Amino acid sequence: NSVDVIISVLDNLKLRNIFYDYIILLQPTSPLRGVRDINKSIELMLFKECASVVSVCKVNHNPLWINTLPDDDSMINFIDNPFLNKSSQDLPHYYKLNGAIYLCDSKRLRDEKSLFIKESCFAFKMNFSHSIDIDSKDDLHLANFFLDKYNS
């Protein structure tokens, strides 16, 4: 996994007396993240004095309106009553990991073998268009749409 690779690289650099206080992992499947996103996430880490920062974006569909269906497709218990008659704007905002930016204190990463230092991790909120994670052809088409939009 990525953490094992990062630790291996840090170990190899240590043999050459090269040390880094922080690492940043930029996934290649998130090509629309920009320099401004990266710089702002670093600023957040320094401001919060935290051990890790992970990028997120708002979900398009609120999970309070999502459920599984029984074999008979009945919707009797599909949505809990408190949320049934609310507009989406009145529901709490939910966020998801977007895979674009992971910042972490190198020592804490090595000690905890994770990019998520739970008691000292903060979210860097990115907009949807910078959060496209290319895992499918549809994602690639969406990324190309935004690239064309930015370049016009």
Feature annotation, model-predicted:
Residues 1-8, 22, 31-120, 125:
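Conserved core of the sugar-phosphate nucleotidyltransferase
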Residues 14-24:
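Short acidic donor-binding loop at the edge of a beta-strand
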Residues 124-125, 129-152:
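Hydrophobic helical membrane-anchoring modules
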